[in-house]
């Protein structure tokens, strides 16, 4: 979203014989345009001056002026962010964003994108932040992907802790309890996630003749569909997402969790490295809602209290 600008148009020349009349008309037109511009500046200043949100002053001026934080998110990852039956974006992240907005005095607008393009969109300034159950890792902080430097990294405002879980069709766990048990089987995952990374690492460890087949999808819902139809032996996703799928898919009759949750790590709100002011404002706002209880209420609403943190930190991932 960009700030609105005053459109200036040139009026058609009047057929006025007297030069003095033309000069007067021109002066009036210039005066009118000048009034519009001054009024716009005053309105913007008045909006900033009258915003009573406790942390509004900590935001970058560009965010203050537009009154909106554009959020890149893969809105297909229940219960963190997803579309309800009416098409509304709901979940842990949207609810937390609403609470952050009250502290900062701006709106958070979610824009849907595939998970593996969110950081790219952040670098390209399509989004102000990425908030999408994104695990804070050193590689992402440093702009490293598959061992290669792909661009400038991002900063993270950490706000939740999640691990990685494996799940299977209900009653068909095939003896799967650990990642080693996946050798010789097929797993479905979402592309560019920690689950995909773990699956790739495990595939390298499997012996010849018992290779782990990996099928990656743009979103987790597609992976669940494949597993539900019998197209794979197991699926993997972040622990709150896997638990939610087990609880809700098919009324709780489609999937079951197997083995232990591994690789506990923080979720973080991703912010461009050159936007330290926004990172600091978001950290302050997150700590404010942790302190006032809004944070806990959101997690309780979605049954996600187990991953709660007591403090929002910057770049706490490893």
What is each PLM-predicted segment?
Residues 30-45:
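Bacterial lipoprotein signal-peptidase II cleavage site
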Residues 70, 106-107, 124-136, 185-188, ...:
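Alpha-to-beta junction loops
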Residues 34, 95-98, 102-103, 170-173, ...:
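Extended ligand-binding regions for polar small-molecule ligands
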Residues 134-149, 200-201, 205, 228-263:
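A ligand-binding cleft/hinge motif common to bilobed small-molecule-binding domains
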Residues 43-134:
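Extracytoplasmic small-molecule ligand-binding "clamshell" domains
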Residues 89-103, 162-219, 234, 239-243:
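Bilobed "Venus flytrap"/periplasmic-binding protein-like clamshell domains
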Residues 107-179:
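Acidic, polar ligand-binding/catalytic clefts
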Residues 158-168, 247-284, 305-318:
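Periplasmic-binding protein-like
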């Amino acid at each position: 979203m960009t700030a609105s600008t005053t459109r200036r148009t040139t009026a058609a020349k009047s057929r006025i014989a007297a030069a003095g009349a033309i000069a007067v008309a021109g002066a009036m037109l210039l005066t009118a345009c000048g009034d519009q511009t001054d009024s716009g500046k005053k309105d913007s200043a008045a909006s900033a001056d009258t915003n009573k949100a406790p942390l509004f002053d900590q935001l970058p001026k560009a965010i203050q002026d537009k009154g909106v934080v554009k959020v890149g998110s893969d809105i297909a990852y229940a219960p963190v962010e997803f579309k309800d039956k009416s098409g509304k974006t709901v979940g842990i992240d949207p609810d937390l964003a609403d609470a952050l907005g009250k502290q900062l005095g701006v709106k958070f607008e979610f824009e849907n994108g595939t998970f593996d393009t969110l950081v790219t969109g952040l670098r390209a300034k399509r989004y102000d932040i990425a908030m999408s159950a994104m695990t804070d890792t050193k590689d992402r902080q440093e702009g490293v992907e598959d061992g290669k430097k792909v661009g400038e990294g991002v900063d993270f405002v950490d706000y939740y802790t999640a691990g990685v879980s494996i799940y299977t069709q209900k009653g068909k766990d095939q003896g799967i309890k650990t990642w080693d048990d996946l050798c010789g089987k097929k797993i479905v995952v979402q592309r560019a996630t920690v689950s995909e990374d773990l699956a790739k690492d495990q595939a390298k460890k499997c012996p010849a003749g018992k290779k782990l087949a990996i099928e990656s999808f743009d979103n987790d819902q597609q992976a669940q569909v494949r597993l539900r139809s019998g197209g794979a032996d197991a699926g993997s996703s972040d622990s709150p997402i896997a638990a939610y799928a087990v609880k809700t898919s098919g009324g709780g009759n489609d999937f079951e969790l197997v083995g232990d949750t591994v690789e506990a790590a923080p979720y973080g709100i991703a912010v461009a490295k050159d936007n330290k002011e926004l990172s600091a404002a978001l950290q302050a706002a997150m700590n404010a809602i942790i302190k006032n209880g809004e944070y806990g209420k959101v997690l309780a609403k979605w049954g996600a209290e187990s991953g709660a943190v007591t403090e929002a930190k910057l770049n706490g991932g490893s």
